[in-house]
């Protein structure tokens, strides 16, 4: 009898421990953001003096990969690369091959990758280990998953930038994978946008500001350094394969020297915008900054975002933008074709609330899902980077946006967004739908017809972490 009772108590004990573990995991993954915090301060909306630098818009995915390889090849002393997602697929392997070649040329390489994605997709790759093992390369993972810090699992590094020799950089919304770079790796490619910036060489300006931000996030004690055994046979073989790959790439003649004067245009000012970089709940510093900038618009504001997932404070931000400008237009993926099922489901739930702010929404459908994050203010300012108009970007993740004062760049982007409106369906604040001249009604895939009604219910309790 005692043995039976003892066995029963052990089962209850294990069941209790398992229940505690499940509650711990679920509670950790659903830590709510500082959704009610919307404090204003001079620190949140005061911008540094803009620097007069040269810029180049990078829209095509093949062009985006080529620019990365050209920048890395041009480096003579230092490379800094930070990315949210890094896959060792075709384009990712090209980038690793270029970085290894740079390290072997005595260029110091520092690489910061979001920890969750690195643990899932990167650290087991022998090609990546070959780079990490090199004496001139240093790799850190931002806030990797730890059982003792599961409550911090939602705090991700969403930045994407590449800095060369403290004099030039590329920043935008693209991850380092075939989904965003190159041409032949996947049929599901997204469309996105980067900007290349060439500094003035003064040691100041936006290049220095971005480097300062990187040094802050690089030094966080929640990061973990990643090292590999460079003498392991499989790592040595991977390194040899990368050298062969790089030789083949450079042999095509596509990785050409950069002619900065011919390939860039002069901007009146370039400013790096960011919020808190620590792995914790964040005040919406960047959201407040973007709101203040949008309030300065007087004619037309265009917001490109893959998805719109707002709380009350973010709806208020849109209302404030509408209060200052004649027209505020959001371009987002049509729910029939958007690549993010969670974002599409939430948009269907929140469509009336979005329109009630006074904005109009263009539901865009194209050959590729849009992953672009851009804000155009009148005919002068363009803001490009990684910030989605959602609560995750506002309160949980690290994000970067680049404010560019350049009417020529703005005009090029306006031409692109005007064409997207021609291809889309525009919803006016009163709910009226206006089809563009080139609009073709998208077909809802069969799986979405069944999935979206379910997701619209399921996501409601935790939409702030989507």
Which residues are covered by each model-predicted region?
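Extended, Lys/Arg-enriched charged tracts that mediate electrostatic binding to polyanionic substrates
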Residues: 140
